[in-house]
Amino acid sequence: MFNKSNALMVFSTLIFSAALSAQDYTYDPQRSAVLLVDPYNEFLSEGGLLYPISKETLDANNAIANMKDLVNAARASGMKVIYVPHHHYREGDYDGWKFGGGSGCVFKAGTWNVEYHPDLQKQPGDLEARQHWKSSGFANTDLDFLLKLHGIDHVILAGMRANTCIESTARYAVELGYHTTLLTDAIGAFNMREMQAAVEIDYPVIGHNVLSTRELIAAIE
């Protein structure tokens, strides 16, 4: 006989057992990488088309500073930082797509908007995957190849947007066999409801670890 209370208890156990605390896990820099997803001016800088609707969550999370601290700590430990960029739109890119592509209004090729935020520029030794067309950094890119080439089997996700590209890339990572860590405060979204749904409901189900930036840095230092 179905018992709602028991079902909720089991579901809660599954959710919260999926994510470990920082004290339970450490990260080998030679086997781990930070995946920095879409750190574009379009999202992160005043003047970006998506900045006005991202600003609330970016400010609430202190997200840009946390992303910067994360990649700096990763580099200092010898861990790879891999940029995972969204496709740069050119006129005609989506012509003939059976179910449509994007609006073509954002991420325009050759513009300041698709440059990386000034505090999150690539550094020598960083890697960059091929651009993803939709949400997942793995679909139709070389990200899986880059990770395997460098012997990496643990990925840590940060960047934009919490409930789309971050979440989709994390789901693919888990399906492909990577130990996957999601961060609660090195991300942004278009509003707090999106952020809360991602962090409180989806991430604990998807990820092996769900940590704050401080917890993650402590686990790699």
Where is each model-derived feature located?
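N-terminal signal peptide c-region/cleavage motif recognized by signal peptidases
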Residues: S17-A18
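Short beta-strand segments at enzyme active-site cores
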Residues: M79-H86, L183
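Acidic/histidine-rich helix-loop elements
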Residues: L44-A60
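Active-site-adjacent betaalpha module
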Residues: F2, A22-A33, K68-S77, F99-E221
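Acidic-leg catalytic submotif of subtilisin-like serine proteases
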Residues: S32-F43
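N-terminal post-signal-peptidase region of extra-cytosolic proteins
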Residues: E56-N66, L70
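Short acidic/His/Gly/Ser-rich catalytic and metal-binding motifs that mark active-site loops
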Residues: F43-G47, E91-D93, M192
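Bacterial N-terminal signal peptides that target proteins for export
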Residues: M1-M9
